[in-house]
């Protein structure tokens, strides 16, 4: 079965100010994933609290809100087969010190004493992805299009994208 999914990715403020946007996007595209929605925004407190509502009341909540609202972010809708799982694996463990080399967080995340800068958010489930995408994107901001190589990977040679 062709499990094409969509997931939300946020390139966080630390990655934006360190000039890592292109590198991170490139990794997803090289993996064969498709960016079907993308924009740069500055997340305000209200949106941050909606996004991270499941963490409200936890000791790290305020630091998380401060972190995600500190500078602009790039939000993306990424599409592909098993996109949620694939993107999570590419992102690596939440804590950069636990993230394997070769993952985005393993290569670019920083653990600075009492703060971690893990450069990227990736939805943790299909349900979370749907909820998170709807927070950042209107339906008309997500695009259907064919990549140049899509025809090559189709099961039938004459299949159209």
From Swiss-Prot:
Record's keyword annotation contains Ion transport:
no
Cite the entry's keywords alphabetically. ATP-binding, Cytoplasm, Kinase, Magnesium, Metal-binding, Nucleotide metabolism, Nucleotide-binding, Phosphoprotein, Transferase
Q: Catalytic activity, per the record?
A: a 2'-deoxyribonucleoside 5'-diphosphate + ATP = a 2'-deoxyribonucleoside 5'-triphosphate + ADP; a ribonucleoside 5'-diphosphate + ATP = a ribonucleoside 5'-triphosphate + ADP
Q: Which SUPFAM superfamilies match?
A: Nucleoside diphosphate kinase, NDK
Give the enzyme's EC designation.
2.7.4.6
**Stated role:** Major role in the synthesis of nucleoside triphosphates other than ATP. The ATP gamma phosphate is transferred to the NDP beta phosphate via a ping-pong mechanism, using a phosphorylated active-site intermediate.
**What is the name of this protein?**
Nucleoside diphosphate kinase
């Amino acid at each position: 079965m062709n499990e094409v999914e969509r997931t939300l990715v946020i390139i966080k403020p630390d990655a934006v100010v360190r000039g890592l946007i292109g590198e991170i996007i490139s990794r997803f595209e090289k993996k064969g994933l498709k960016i079907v929605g993308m924009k740069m925004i500055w997340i305000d407190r209200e949106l941050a609290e909606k996004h991270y509502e499941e963490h409200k009341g936890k000791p790290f909540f305020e630091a998380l809100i401060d972190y995600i609202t500190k500078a602009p972010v790039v939000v993306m809708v990424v599409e592909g087969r098993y996109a949620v799982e694939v993107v999570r694996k590419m992102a690596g463990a939440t804590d950069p010190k636990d993230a394997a080399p070769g993952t985005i967080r393993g290569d670019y995340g920083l653990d600075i004493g009492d703060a971690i800068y893990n450069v990227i958010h990736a939805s943790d489930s299909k349900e979370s992805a749907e909820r998170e995408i709807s927070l950042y994107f209107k339906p008309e901001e997500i695009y259907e299009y064919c990549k140049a190589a899509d025809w090559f990977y189709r099961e039938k040679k004459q299949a159209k994208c």
